[in-house]
């Protein structure tokens, strides 16, 4: 079976410009004016793209996967790190060269001058989650077509750019933290949580449409509701507390997998673990820890008590032994010494995290960290990155090996001529490993099957389907 290349640097980030164009076009039945669309960046940006595309479809526009026959192209950009900025500017350049009429939105759009310096011919620029402004600009350059809404019905979940069996659910915008390496608050503002009733309504529609996995995302998921001042919302006529634990509990009752991403290590994360142990939500935490040196964490303006982190991890695993922890770290942060880096390696060895991504520090325009201490050379960053990944590869292999011989639920993502490719509760789409079931070509994406794990490496699992009758006999 063909094994896709795993990128250990990748975190919860989705880069799918081609997929965006094709997926939106495939669902399009409108016959109005044509809009091209490119979506870059993280799942939060993907959700923004879905919302814009949904409104375009409602207004009667057709979304096309070709620049040539588009009346206008929208590029939803990312501006988090320099590589993302470069990719976004390249995408804008390509759209201008191939089409000529381009509207830019997204995180990089918050830096209009930076875009205009490189691409002065862009029609309009808006910042992130500026849905109404984007549509207003589209109407200006490509008037709304006359159309019969009954001939271009939109699914109740809106346009989705993910496979039909999973979807991202964004629960808030912005962030109140001020990590020195990050400029997201400057781009997307402070925390702004959606009303709980609105979130749960959307989740219910997703499940009713056939979604089997809900991936909860935001800039700071565990902070959900902090800005609500303890106010209660209502859903289905019942009061719902607006905090992440209460929201997760309600989501867990809907009958789909619920996976939490972007969890900041607040003390109340402890309250989520019993929900995982009960099976209400998946025993999976995406919790970026960034470093383990107290000195570096202080410079990052991140929680600095590593001993408490280790105690929390031990406590969580005692409550929920199946818990899978994914994290990301930065090596080569300004001022990082060899001693700081060794502390990070020691933390990895002690914490035994399941999935880990690593980034070499990259200067982000406007980030405080750029001038906080002496910058680390590229050679040193590269060396530390490889040493980091070498240590973690052994740990990840050990953690995955515990699943061998175990029967697990596998959600099928894809099927090719060699068999099926799926994921277990331990694997988020796009960023984690996969489960390969060789020879099972009759399965279909979206199926949830039982399989026994036969083999593992540092990234992936291999499995064989379990005969349902045989499993019933064993359980009896």
Curated annotation (Swiss-Prot):
Coiled coil: none annotated. One of its GO terms (molecular function) is 4 iron, 4 sulfur cluster binding. PROSITE patterns: MTTASE_N, MTTASE_RADICAL, RADICAL_SAM, TRAM. InterPro entries: Elp3/MiaA/NifB-like_rSAM (IPR006638), Methylthiotransferase (IPR005839), Methylthiotransferase_CS (IPR020612), Methylthiotransferase_N (IPR013848), Methylthiotransferase_N_sf (IPR038135), NA-bd_OB-fold (IPR012340), Ribosomal_uS12_MeSTrfase_RimO (IPR005840), rSAM (IPR007197). [4Fe-4S] cluster 1 binds at residues 42, 78, 107. [4Fe-4S] cluster 2 binds at residues 175, 179, 182. Its EC number is 2.8.4.4. It comes from the Bacteria. It catalyses: L-aspartate(89)-[ribosomal protein uS12]-hydrogen + (sulfur carrier)-SH + AH2 + 2 S-adenosyl-L-methionine = 3-methylsulfanyl-L-aspartate(89)-[ribosomal protein uS12]-hydrogen + (sulfur carrier)-H + 5'-deoxyadenosine + L-methionine + A + S-adenosyl-L-homocysteine + 2 H(+). Disulfide bonds: none annotated. Binds 2 [4Fe-4S] clusters. One cluster is coordinated with 3 cysteines and an exchangeable S-adenosyl-L-methionine. CDD domains: Radical_SAM. It is found in: Cytoplasm. Residues 33-143 form the MTTase N-terminal domain. GO terms for cellular component: cytosol. Residues 161-398 form the Radical SAM core domain. Keywords: 4Fe-4S, Cytoplasm, Iron, Iron-sulfur, Metal-binding, S-adenosyl-L-methionine, Transferase. GO terms for biological process: tRNA modification. The keyword Glycosyltransferase does not apply. Its main location: cytoplasm. Residues 401-467 form the TRAM domain. NCBIfam families: 30S ribosomal protein S12 methylthiotransferase RimO, MiaB/RimO family radical SAM methylthiotransferase. Catalyzes the methylthiolation of an aspartic acid residue of ribosomal protein uS12. Belongs to the methylthiotransferase family. RimO subfamily. This is Ribosomal protein uS12 methylthiotransferase RimO. It comes from Shewanella sp. (strain MR-4).
């Amino acid at each position: 079976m063909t094994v896709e290349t795993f990128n250990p640097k990748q975190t919860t980030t989705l880069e799918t410009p081609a997929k965006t164009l094709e997926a939106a076009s495939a669902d399009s039945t409108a016959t109005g004016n044509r809009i091209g669309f490119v979506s870059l960046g993280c799942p939060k940006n993907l959700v923004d793209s879905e919302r814009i595309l949904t409104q375009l479809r409602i207004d009667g526009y057709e979304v096309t996967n070709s620049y040539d026959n588009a009346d206008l192209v929208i590029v939803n950009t990312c501006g988090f790190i320099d590589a993302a900025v470069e990719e976004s500017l390249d995408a804008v350049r390509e759209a201008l060269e191939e089409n000529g009429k381009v509207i830019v939105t997204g995180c990089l759009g918050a830096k209009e001058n930076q875009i205009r310096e490189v691409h002065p011919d862009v029609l309009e620029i808006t910042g992130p989650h500026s849905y109404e402004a984007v549509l207003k600009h589209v109407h200006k350059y490509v008037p709304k077509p006359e159309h019969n809404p009954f001939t271009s019905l939109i699914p109740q979940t809106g346009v989705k750019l993910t496979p039909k069996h999973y979807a991202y659910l964004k629960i808030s915008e912005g962030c109140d933290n001020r990590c020195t390496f990050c400029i997201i608050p400057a781009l997307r503002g402070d925390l702004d949580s959606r009303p709980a009733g609105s979130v749960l309504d959307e989740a219910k529609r997703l499940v009713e449409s056939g979604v089997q996995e809900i991936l909860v995302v935001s800039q700071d998921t565990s902070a959900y509701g902090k800005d609500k001042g303890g106010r209660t919302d209502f859903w289905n006529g019942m009061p719902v507390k607006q905090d992440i634990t209460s929201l997760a509990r309600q989501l867990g009752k809907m009958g789909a997998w619920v996976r939490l991403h972007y969890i900041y290590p607040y003390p109340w994360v402890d309250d989520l673990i019993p929900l995982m142990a009960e099976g209400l939500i998946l025993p999976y935490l995406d919790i970026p820890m960034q470093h383990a040196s107290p000195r570096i964490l202080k410079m990052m303006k991140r929680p600095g008590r590593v001993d408490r982190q280790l105690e929390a991890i031990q406590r969580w695993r005692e409550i929920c032994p199946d818990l899978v922890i994914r994290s990301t770290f930065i090596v080569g942060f300004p001022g990082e010494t060899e001693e700081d880096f060794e502390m990070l390696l020691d933390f990895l060895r002690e914490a035994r995290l399941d999935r880990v991504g690593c980034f070499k520090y990259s200067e982000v325009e406007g980030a405080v960290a750029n001038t906080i201490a002496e910058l680390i050379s590229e050679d040193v960053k590269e060396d530390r990155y490889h040493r980091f990944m070498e240590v973690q590869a052994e740990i990840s292999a050990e953690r995955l090996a515990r699943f061998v011989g175990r029967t697990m639920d596998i959600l099928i993502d894809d099927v090719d001529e060699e068999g099926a490719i799926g994921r277990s509760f331990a694997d988020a789409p796009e960023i984690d490993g996969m489960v390969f079931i060789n020879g099972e070509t009759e399965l279909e994406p979206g199926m949830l099957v039982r399989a026994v794990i036969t083999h593992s490496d540092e990234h992936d699992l291999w499995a064989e389907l379990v005969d349902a009758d045989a499993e019933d006999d064993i359980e009896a």
